[in-house]
Amino acid sequence: MGVPSFFRWLSRKYPKIISPVLEEQPQIVDGVILPLDYSASNPNGELDNLYLDMNGIVHPCSHPENKPPPETEDEMLLAVFEYTNRVLNMARPRKVLVMAVDGVAPRAKMNQQRARRFRSARDAQIENEAREEIMRQREEVGEIIDDAVRNKKTWDSNAITPGTPFMDKLAAALRYWTAFKLATDPGWKNLQVIISDATVPGEGEHKIMNFIRSQRADPEYNPNTTHCIYGLDADLIFLGLATHEPHFKILREDVFAQDNRKRNNLKDTINMTEEEKQFLQKQNSEQPFLWLHINVLREYLSAELWVPGLPFTFDLERAIDDWVFMCFFCGNDFLPHLPCLDVRENSIDILLDIWKVVLPKLKTYMTCDGVLNLPSVETLLQHLGSREGDIFKTRHIQEARKKEAFERRKAQKNMSKGQDRHPTVATEQLQMYDTQGNLAKGSWNLTTSDMVRLKKELMLANEGNEEAIAKVKQQSDKNNELMKDISKEEIDDAVSKANKTNFNLAEVMKQKIINKKHRLEKDNEEEEIAKDSKKVKTEKAESECDLDAEIKDEIVADVNDRENSETTEVSRDSPVHSTVNVSEGPKNGVFDTDEFVKLFEPGYHERYYTAKFHVTPQDIEQLRKDMVKCYIEGVAWVLMYYYQGCASWNWFYPYHYAPLATDFHGFSHLEIKFEEGTPFLPYEQLMSVLPAASGHALPKIFRSLMSEPDSEIIDFYPEEFPIDMNGKKMSWQGIALLPFIDQDRLLTAVRAQYPLLSDAERARNIRGEPVLLISNKNANYERFSKKLYSKENNNNNVVVKFQHFKSGLSGIVSKDVEGFELNGKIVCPIQGGSLPNLSTTLILKMSYRLIPLPSRNKSIILNGFIPSEPVLTAYDLDSIMYKYNNQNYSRRWNFGNDLKQNIVPVGPKGITQYKPRTGGYRAFFYFAELSRNNVQPAHNYGRNSYNSQPGFNNSRYDGGNNNYRQNSNYRNNNYSGNRNSGQYSGNSYSRNNKQSRYDNSRANRR
């Protein structure tokens, strides 16, 4: 989700929420790599359910950052299998595995998908042009480029969208690989695998959320089920908190470890040797992973969100929901973030401070089970609005200081390298001589870049080649025309700037030339607008200038928002910004409206709406009211989406920008209602989000709608579109100002083509259902196979409802819509990889549906749960409550949890911060079963702190009294001694005399 740097900020502020994954390495015997034993105990602790957001796996496998991309789609799918298998060997779920692929998204998400895919197509075009230029330069120096390399084009990642042939092949491949593992891996015998492919509407992570909500509604659900979700998106943290499941963690790659990796640019990957590819493959396979523990985050938040003196009872679950809601204002995939809020500037802390001030004055919390309390929200935003001007001024001062500090460090670095000299001026007049040494008539005006590019022609021209002389003269005349209006004063100014910033003079002059090209293009466009109003060509020189910036921006994006370089390297890496025409708005190019708005100066309110919406001052008030109404509807929709499911498939926010915080007033009595509607079909979404350049992913009958000038919806697919940097530094952070889709016009045009679809194309344009696959060792195999696939039963409408107790899964199953047979065969859909066809005698495949929720989902901890042992020390809690770190989060690249802290004991507790009672009859039977089977509870984080005896570290369960005799290492929950040694005893924890204050704070809370 669109919350840049949220994970980085969160892990720095709450360092103990993360810990490294303990990954077993396969053994190598006689050069053969032996697979890991999936059934062996997990060094990270046992896990019940694992959820995979498959798009987070497919994308990096299709275009990896540290190695050349796969040559074919089959290689991509094999890479997906390998990566998924590695994740499963780390997590080792024992009961349920859910693979969720993004299906058709709500309209609110489509706008963001549309912007991403249009920019992705543009980046792919730039990369292809860069490849061609690199190959041309290499051929000029005599290098031979193979035809296979020359003709290869970058694979279009926009194919990873529901309805494309690739997604259809991905679904078949996942079903095959799951069946293969169930049939061949003994460790999978009890695993139940649900695959929700792209034909099932909804985003992958929210399909997972719907699954968890459905399981919690089952009366037989075990409240101590352990959950883990894999993915890099920031919203997975919100989703983990929104489930209110106490045993939840997130598995993700360690992005901190990536920072020191060598990254390969475009030139490196064109003619890479096999040895280099194998090295990168090994380096990529060694990418470390880490856990993010939601239960530890809840511990931090229990201290962070504590507010004394409330007129109502403090409820941690409601407070966490309010915290999640406030984070939405800093960024999400459905709404633009408020201009005054940025996670990197500790905006969440600003909102939290306001929340703590206003909460005692309110009657209740801001949210309840995903529903907003609008008067409370208005109070919060009004207080934020009163701080908005100061926030903008502080941001401007900090950015100026960072820029000054960077330039100072850069100058010192250059001086130490002897680079503080006057920059070399590019040769402006290059004299040419004939073969007899006579001076040629006239003179050439060539830049250094021209001389490098025309090196071969210059050599031939010196030898008297007329064709080469003509080509060089053509470039010289072109430069003369461009330099005609640039005065000597401007040249001197460029030299001065180059001296001041240590930039290359040629680059500064090139920018001046390109700026003039912008003016010439604009004049030509106005003259020829009657002839051609839609086709605007970009000059070759502009493409060359922007090429390096685009590639560098992609590298910076992969490094995951490296803050220190974001504010400092823009002047070299960001594209040239054009002048903003606030009266009508630019038609293409990259610009920055914030250069005109100047949010840090008085009067920014009117300038903001004038520059970004091109309205007159008289129309601002009406625009403001409508934007505030739509934005509040949006945050209500987002909150409902996270806690209850999609409230409306057709609602979307109809603006590219958010209102200012000072404008949020007068909405407390707003009545918010949503019409649920229905999701688009896959082809309808493809036509909504894909650019014309990606039309190859659609059936041919739709492509003319995207490219023909007489198409009734041609205006939805602009070839050029403006990008507003909106005050950001890197090009990927800019806002693509694309026209919003008119749903009625689009659906009318698309549905008129449906009768022309082939059967195969029509099969990809459906709303499907998830499938459930189990092995013949599963507890439900006999029941399901007999009722659904027996020869005596020919009724295709038979459904079987089953509940959680027997297998840890509940739902409704029916016959597989693809015609699964008990004695059939599953054909491998992938060429290569030596994967065999499978017999279906060892597995069972069924259509799967969730049990409908009887009522609204409640945001509570379920009765009968068993809390984990606390991980945080008194000092950790004090540092949050009393802000010892003063908001300077300095964890850097170290883990808050080391390996020892990752292995924490888990056991029943008599005193807990949660309101529902602990234990109960479910816990009694749960522990009785554990004792009989001599196994560890599934919500442990490790095994090293347990001895060979069953139970919880030599503790004894005394009937139903919730009285436990704990090991002396954990007596009275009050720790003392050396914090690093892990040995705790006694009744107090002594650390800088902080314990007394901590005890007093706990007493006050009670």
Swiss-Prot record:
GO terms for cellular component: Las1 complex; mitochondrion; nucleus; RNA polymerase II termination complex. One of its GO terms (biological process) is negative regulation of transcription elongation by RNA polymerase II. Changing H518Y: Causes mislocalization to the cytoplasm and suppresses the requirement for XRN1 function. Residues 561-575, 996-1006 have a biased composition (Basic and acidic residues). It comes from the Eukaryota. It is found in: Nucleus. Its EC number is 3.1.13.-. Optimum pH is 8.0-8.8. Changing K537E: Causes mislocalization to the cytoplasm and suppresses the requirement for XRN1 function. Its cofactor is Mg(2+); Mn(2+). Residues 955-999 are annotated as: 2 X 4 AA repeats of S-R-Y-D, N-N-N-Y, Y-S-G-N. Residues 939-956 have a biased composition (Polar residues). Residues 256-287, 453-544 form a coiled coil. Gene3D superfamilies: 1.25.40.1050, 3.40.50.12390. Inhibited by nucleoside 3', 5'-bisphosphates. The modification Phosphoserine is found at S574. CDD domains: PIN_XRN1-2-like. The keyword rRNA processing applies. It is an enzyme of class 3 (hydrolase). GO terms for molecular function: 5'-3' RNA exonuclease activity; mRNA binding; RNA binding; rRNA binding. Residues 561-584, 939-1006 are annotated as: Disordered. Present with 623 molecules/cell in log phase SD medium. Belongs to the 5'-3' exonuclease family. XRN2/RAT1 subfamily. Interacts with RAI1 and RTT103. This is 5'-3' exoribonuclease 2. It comes from Saccharomyces cerevisiae (strain ATCC 204508 / S288c). The lineage of its organism: Eukaryota, Fungi, Dikarya, Ascomycota, Saccharomycotina. The gene is RAT1.
